[in-house]
């Protein structure tokens, strides 16, 4: 299994969404891990973006982990709870504090909000 990684797509910005509409990203993996800052969780248009159709067609599985920007735009971190899953397509989903097994590989998907950083 080949794993491809991306982060910080920021699809909440029209310029980024427009760019991806006309500039297809290279597909180099079977599984795509999107590690945070993809779109605002409260954005009602985000789940129907063309990007998810593309991801659905090009990857066996797309695993999305929320980053800090997912909670921007007045979204309460604890509103969804400590552990949750939100499927955008059959093979495309957000995972918070979840383990997903694909073949013989376990993906531990979590974002530690408010982690202490030493100075």
Regions found by a protein language model. Give the residues of each.
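Active-site beta-loop-alpha junctions enriched in small/polar residues
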Residues: 9-10, 69, 99, 112
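Conserved catalytic scaffold of divalent metal-dependent phosphoesterases
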Residues: 82-119
């Amino acid at each position: 299994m080949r794993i491809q990684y991306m982060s910080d797509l920021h699809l909440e910005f029209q310029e980024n969404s427009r760019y991806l509409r006309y500039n297809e990203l290279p597909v180099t993996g079977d599984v795509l891990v999107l590690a945070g800052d993809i779109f605002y969780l409260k954005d009602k248009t985000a789940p129907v973006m063309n990007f998810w159709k593309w991801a659905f067609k090009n990857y066996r599985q797309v695993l999305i982990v929320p980053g800090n920007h997912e909670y921007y735009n007045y979204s309460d971190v604890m509103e969804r709870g400590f552990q949750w899953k939100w499927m955008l397509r059959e093979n495309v989903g957000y995972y918070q504090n979840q383990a997903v097994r694909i073949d013989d590989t376990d993906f531990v998907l979590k974002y530690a909000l408010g982690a202490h950083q030493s100075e």
